[in-house]
């Protein structure tokens, strides 16, 4: 079996991919095509090596991440590779949230350089022993993918570092982006080799694989796909600087569920989708959802937890108790503050040390009684920034120790080595306060670990001679900019840049009364112990299952090329309107009602010229000339404009301002059900709208005879939407006793009389036709926007109208392939005019003319021919 990956980004768009050598595996391959799911042939050389050979009823989760939850080392005697589970890996720990019947398949890279000649053997061993499928990236690609794009571009940007610093020069390197895309493609190939798309759930982790969902969704339109981002997501002003911003957003939107640690991260993501892709979101029954081409992409907000059992087992080790006694003796009579951080520019270690220096300056009584133990984990990245951060950390610690230290006393102790787990746990358990001062961090589980270690275990209590009923306390000083901060309501939150405030917070934590310390600890322990990693994983998967329930109730097909690919999901009955079918019905009916929207239906929405061209007028005149037809243009535009533009069509009916004004032909007078006295509400609405217009730059007010409309499409997207919501609430309150309705639409808030809509206008026309003894036996309605959905709903309800002698043939058609109440669609205005031209030709006696025109349209006639 051969895996395929991109050589460059242009190749990606054409899907002309280079070959990479890959492990031979006897695994089945399945795929879906639009509307159909089928299984392709896949050889089974050995059932024992088949990941899919387990009981088909057994739940299976495919976990995809950059690194597998494995530790690898080569046996020095045999030269063979040996593997074991990495017990500290979140990917392994999340299994606690599921039953023992759940099968897990892991896909990712190894933290070891496996030679090409050994890759097949290693792959087979990992599949048999661990249910793991390794991805082997070529060395150059791995460096460009991980150290290049992930650590050089995404990681700094997601932590709010803009690519505008002089020492970085031209920060964006497209070759690194191409490697990122190619690596994600290789990951997708591994998933495709093992997945059963009808049954399996795929859970992708973190920013390394943000375009992987696009590759998987392209191959399996109905794949059950979740993604969790373990880093921060920056504000739209930061994120929009990324040249490939849209591709990454679309990648995530090809998932069914996207998870974030905090609402702030989710809010920034939603803002980016709104500002850059024009997408709206709404909350239904507590779940946030984005409508994306007929699919609802749900947003999950839940911080990850820790593995309680793993930490408690370390607390019970004799080596941990021995280290705790050593720490107790070494720092007897002193208060311990603990910091545990990676050595990088975002963990704020130097700011923490400066705050400690300020503490000793301000609170002189703390001198000689306080020790900061700072454990420095090895840096995950390399570079000039990391070296400068390390240099500053050591110089600051040295300065503090020289100024405030003494013989046998160091106020700052840096432990810059690989610290064993038992030793780190002992420091957690003995520290009086934990200080986490990161300037930006996705989650940071250090506070959670500290809380659990301070609670202790019966085994630890016995070893340390502590009474089991003794009060437990813990104090946390945490940065406002880390993901766990919102969930720790009892912690003292600080701005890490304000070193004076941090110093004051540490002093407060150390001098706080024991009762309050105990109450804060109990509150934190209850939360952390009930929201562990198992709870987090189970909750995410439950929401993913809920998000995928509608997969097989809709018709799906893919649109777009390369990384712009997305799936359009619509009703199974939704199809392209066949010219042949409607013309046949048209000829066999005697009374027809035809309703047409104006903007976006007869005239392109994007056109600056809004007057109808000669072709539109000719088609309308021809249709209106048939005495069997009642033709109406139903629009939100004013009656004066429509009357002027459509004046050549004398027999054309017009419903202006969404049906507030109706005229049956140019020879008739305009009708309305409302008098000018009933419009007194305008004097109440206009001042309110004007105040919002003045306060919202870019907004305008449209004055109609029947309505007032506040537009905010040219305002800031977020601020405009916020103002629109507030204006809606304000007007609903002011107009509660007035005979009007307040509606919020696409970038508008509109106030109009009750009973005014395109749907009611259509009902009025059909009712009048019935009263005149000419009930329609065919009704056709074509429109393109939200207001036209009222028309579609109205004509579909006419089927059950008891006033009609028999149900008419109904053709509700929207312009553009998008979710709609209509049963049919046409692609664009050009298709609409071709359809109307076909009907006009059928009306005339020149049958050959229609046949000639119809044959030219046959290539895009029936939706079924596409399937």
UniProtKB/Swiss-Prot annotation:
<dbReference type="InterPro" id="IPR001830">
    <property type="entry name" value="Glyco_trans_20"/>
</dbReference>
<feature type="modified residue" description="Phosphothreonine">
    <location>
        <position position="32"/>
    </location>
</feature>
<feature type="modified residue" description="Phosphoserine">
    <location>
        <position position="5"/>
    </location>
</feature>
<dbReference type="GO" id="GO:0005992">
    <property type="term" value="P:trehalose biosynthetic process"/>
</dbReference>
<dbReference type="Pfam" id="PF02358">
    <property type="entry name" value="Trehalose_PPase"/>
</dbReference>
<dbReference type="InterPro" id="IPR036412">
    <property type="entry name" value="HAD-like_sf"/>
</dbReference>
<dbReference type="Pfam" id="PF00982">
    <property type="entry name" value="Glyco_transf_20"/>
</dbReference>
<keyword id="KW-0808">Transferase</keyword>
<dbReference type="InterPro" id="IPR023214">
    <property type="entry name" value="HAD_sf"/>
</dbReference>
<comment type="similarity">
    <text>In the C-terminal section; belongs to the trehalose phosphatase family.</text>
</comment>
<keyword id="KW-0328">Glycosyltransferase</keyword>
<feature type="region of interest" description="Glycosyltransferase">
    <location>
        <begin position="59"/>
        <end position="546"/>
    </location>
</feature>
<protein>
    <recommendedName>
        <fullName>Probable alpha,alpha-trehalose-phosphate synthase [UDP-forming] 9</fullName>
        <ecNumber>2.4.1.15</ecNumber>
    </recommendedName>
</protein>
<dbReference type="GO" id="GO:0016757">
    <property type="term" value="F:glycosyltransferase activity"/>
</dbReference>
<keyword id="KW-0597">Phosphoprotein</keyword>
<dbReference type="InterPro" id="IPR003337">
    <property type="entry name" value="Trehalose_PPase"/>
</dbReference>
<comment type="similarity">
    <text>In the N-terminal section; belongs to the glycosyltransferase 20 family.</text>
</comment>
<dbReference type="InterPro" id="IPR006379">
    <property type="entry name" value="HAD-SF_hydro_IIB"/>
</dbReference>
């Amino acid at each position: 079996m051969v895996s395929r990956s991109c050589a460059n980004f242009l190749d990606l768009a054409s899907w002309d991919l280079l070959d990479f050598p890959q492990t031979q595996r006897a695994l089945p391959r399945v795929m879906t095509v639009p509307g159909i799911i089928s299984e392709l042939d896949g050889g089974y050389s050995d059932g024992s090596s088949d990941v899919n050979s387990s009981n088909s009823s057994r739940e299976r989760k495919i976990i995809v991440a950059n690194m597998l939850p494995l530790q690898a080392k080569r046996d020095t005697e045999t030269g063979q590779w040996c593997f074991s589970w990495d017990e500290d890996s979140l990917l392994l720990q999340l299994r606690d949230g599921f039953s023992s019947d759940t099968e897990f398949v892991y896909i990712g890279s190894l933290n070891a350089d496996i030679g090409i000649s050994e890759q097949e053997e290693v792959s087979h061993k990992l599949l048999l022993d661990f249910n793991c499928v390794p991805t082997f990236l070529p060395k150059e690609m791995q460096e460009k993918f991980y150290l290049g794009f992930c650590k050089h571009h995404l990681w700094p940007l997601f932590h709010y570092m803009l690519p505008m610093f002089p020492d970085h020069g031209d920060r964006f390197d497209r070759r690194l982006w191409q490697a990122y895309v190619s690596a994600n493609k290789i990951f997708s190939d591994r998933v495709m080799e093992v997945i059963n798309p009808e049954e399996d759930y795929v859970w992708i982790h973190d920013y390394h694989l943000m375009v992987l969902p696009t590759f998987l969704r392209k191959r399996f339109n109905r794949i059950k796909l979740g993604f969790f981002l373990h880093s921060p997501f920056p504000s739209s002003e930061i994120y929009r600087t990324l040249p490939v911003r849209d591709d990454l957003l679309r990648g995530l939107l090809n998932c069914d569920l996207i998870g974030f640690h905090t609402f702030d991260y989710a809010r920034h993501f939603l803002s980016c989708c709104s500002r850059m892709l024009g997408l709206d979101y709404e909350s239904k029954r507590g779940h946030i959802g984005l409508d994306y081409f007929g699919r609802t992409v749900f947003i999950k907000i839940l911080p990850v937890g820790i593995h309680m059992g793993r930490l408690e087992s370390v607390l019970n080790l004799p080596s941990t108790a021995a280290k705790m006694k050593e720490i107790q003796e070494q720092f007897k009579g002193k208060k311990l503050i603990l910091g545990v951080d990676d050595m990088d520019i975002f963990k704020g270690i130097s700011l923490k040390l400066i705050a400690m220096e300020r503490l000793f300056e301000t609170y002189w009584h703390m001198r000689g009684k306080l020790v900061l133990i700072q454990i420095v984990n090895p840096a995950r990245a390399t570079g000039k920034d990391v070296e400068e951060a390390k240099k500053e950390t050591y110089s600051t610690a040295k300065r503090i120790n020289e100024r405030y230290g003494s013989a046998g006393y160091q106020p700052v102790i840096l432990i810059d080595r690989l610290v064993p787990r038992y030793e780190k746990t002992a420091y957690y358990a003995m520290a009086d306060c934990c200080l986490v001062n990161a300037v930006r961090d996705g989650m940071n589980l250090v506070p959670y670990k500290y809380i659990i270690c301070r609670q202790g275990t019966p085994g630890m209590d016995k070893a340390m001679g502590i009474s089991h009923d003794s009060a437990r306390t813990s104090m946390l000083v945490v940065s406002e900019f880390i993901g766990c901060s919102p969930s720790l309501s009892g912690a003292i939150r600080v701005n890490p840049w304000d070193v004076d405030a941090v110093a004051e917070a540490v002093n407060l934590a150390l001098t706080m009364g024991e009762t309050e310390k105990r109450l804060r600890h109990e509150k934190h322990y209850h939360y952390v112990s009930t929201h562990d990693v198992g709870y987090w994983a189970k909750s995410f998967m439950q929401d993913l299952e809920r998000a995928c329930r509608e997969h097989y109730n809709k018709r799906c097909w893919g649109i777009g090329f390369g990384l712009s690919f997305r799936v359009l999901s619509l009703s199974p009955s939704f199809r392209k309107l066949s010219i042949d079918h409607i013309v046949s019905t048209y000829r066999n009916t005697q009374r027809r009602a035809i309703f047409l929207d104006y903007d976006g239906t007869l005239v392109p929405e994007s056109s600056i010229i809004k007057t109808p061209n000669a072709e539109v007028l000719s088609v309308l005149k021809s249709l209106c000339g048939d005495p069997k037809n009642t033709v109406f243009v139903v629009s939100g535009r004013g009656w004066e404009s429509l009357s002027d533009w459509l004046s050549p069509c004398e027999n054309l009916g017009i419903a202006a301002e969404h049906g507030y004004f109706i005229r049956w032909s140019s020879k008739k007078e305009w009708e309305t059900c409302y008098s000018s006295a009933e419009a007194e509400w305008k004097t109440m609405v206009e001042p309110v709208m004007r105040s919002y217009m003045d306060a919202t730059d870019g907004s305008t007010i449209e004055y109609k005879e029947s309505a007032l409309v506040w537009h905010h499409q040219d305002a800031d997207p977020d601020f405009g939407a916020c103002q629109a919501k507030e204006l809606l609430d304000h007007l609903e309150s002011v107009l509660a006793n007035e005979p009007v309705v307040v509606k919020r639409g696409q970038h508008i808030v509109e106030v109009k009389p009750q009973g005014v809509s395109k749907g009611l206008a259509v009902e009025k026309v059909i009712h009048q036709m019935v009263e005149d003894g000419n009930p329609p036996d065919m009704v056709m309605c074509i429109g393109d926007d939200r207001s036209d959905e009222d028309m579609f709903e109205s004509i579909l309800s006419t089927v059950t109208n008891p006033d009609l002698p028999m149900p008419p043939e109904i053709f509700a058609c929207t312009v553009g392939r998008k979710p709609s109440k209509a049963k049919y669609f046409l692609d664009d205005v050009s298709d609409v005019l071709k359809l109307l031209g076909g009907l006009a030709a059928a009306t005339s006696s020149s049958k050959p003319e229609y046949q000639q025109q119809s044959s030219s349209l046959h290539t895009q006639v029936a939706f079924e021919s596409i399937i």
